[in-house]
Amino acid sequence: MSLRRLFIKLLLVVSVLGFSTSLFANEQDDLKAHFLEELDDIIKIIEDKKLTKDERNSKIVAELTPMFDFKLMAKLSLGKKAWMKLSKDEQERFVALYVERMKNSYSSKIDSYENEEIKITDIKRKKNRISLETEIATAEKNLKVVYKFYKPKKRKKDKDTWLIYDVEIIGISILKADKAQFKEFLRTKTIEALMEALAEQKTT
């Protein structure tokens, strides 16, 4: 089972989760309420039999987008050295391609939604970052999944107050996995070739 397939499953069923902490209670309660509200909406979309597959996927992606800082994820996945070599226009192009890749990945995994049992195991906060540790029970074994949120100093347009910038599944960071993949690609090829490869994924 792929990391991204597990990830979208977790996003879709996490509405059963609850947050519990005595520190920063008000802010984390707000995060809980909004996060669960968004995910409840996603469940309703999935269960709406009147929607076509494309309509359903489009609506779900629209619900997920405000929860993630895809631009930051794109920048971090490419790495500072490679990012700084890009012009502003190239940076914008890379971000657009990365975002499209992520959205397509999530959309393609929606049909695999199942009602696995998930429970909160821990919540850790350090300044403007929150790590929400969960455990998902599958037929094979229990898997540890960590959602990583951060709070931007300034609220981003059309985005939530707290944003997901990475997810770790059984100790493997989606962000770091992308970074390693891109780094290996760039050992022998150019940034332009990488963007062309990402563009080709849009059509496949």
Region roles according to the model:
Residues 19-27:
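Sec/Tat signal peptide C-region and signal peptidase I cleavage site
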Residues 104-146, 204:
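Surface-exposed, charged secondary-structure patches
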Residues 142-144, 149-177:
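Short beta-strand edge/turn micro-motifs at domain boundaries
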Residues 9-20:
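Bacterial N-terminal signal peptides
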Residues 1-10:
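Twin-arginine (Tat) signal peptide motif
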Residues 70, 86, 93, 124-126, ...:
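Bimodal feature
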Residues 28-109:
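Early exported N-terminus immediately downstream of N-terminal targeting peptides
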Residues 166-204:
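Low-complexity, intrinsically disordered terminal/linker segments enriched in charged
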